[in-house]
Amino acid sequence: MNAETVALAVSRFKLSPNHKLKLVFNGAEYLYDDSIMIECNNTCMTLSSKLDDGKIHTLYIEYSFIQGVEVIEG
């Protein structure tokens, strides 16, 4: 499934505890757990999470950099 399809399907979601987001961008594979909030708009996917420092950190990824996205059990 390409990133644009995900963006059209949902605009904001959070994974259930038994699922992870597998995201491939810039040639590397990343695995995110249910602690992230995922938002999609017309140009990018946004991943937000509260880290150990207590602050919310946000990563904006333009769709053109995403090679694959998948929700997996685990």
Feature-to-residue mapping (PLM):
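Acidic, aromatic-enriched beta-alpha/helix-loop junctions
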Residues: 44-67
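Structured surface patches comprising rigid loops and adjacent beta-strands/short helices at the edges
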Residues: 35, 61-74
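Generic serine detector
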Residues: 11, 16, 35, 48-49, ...
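Short glycine-rich, low-complexity segments
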Residues: 1-29, 72
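Acidic, low-complexity, intrinsically disordered interaction modules
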Residues: 29-51
